[in-house]
């Protein structure tokens, strides 16, 4: 009797054939880069995010650079992406990562969720994609 591939095997096979692997935030993955992409992608199409992400990373290549930037500069760079609360929360969260965690993103979902604008799915992405850990991503 032939056994059918499991759901996870079929899903991974589908990803190998059709999954996106060349997006800017998929290169040189760090917790910071994963976090920025996850926040930008909330309620925003990938094609819209790509140029914003590229510009944002060129101006703020590290969480420290973002934390030290004036909020007005961050909001100006965000112009056109919408949902400005995301940028405000990112700026405040960056300041907290620098001041409370020595510039290193926590590797715990529970701790990440204490930062402004980071919910369960974003925290899971940071842990899994940025730190190489295991956490659910919705």
Model regions: which residues?
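Catalytic cores of DNA base-excision repair glycosylases
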Residues: 3-138
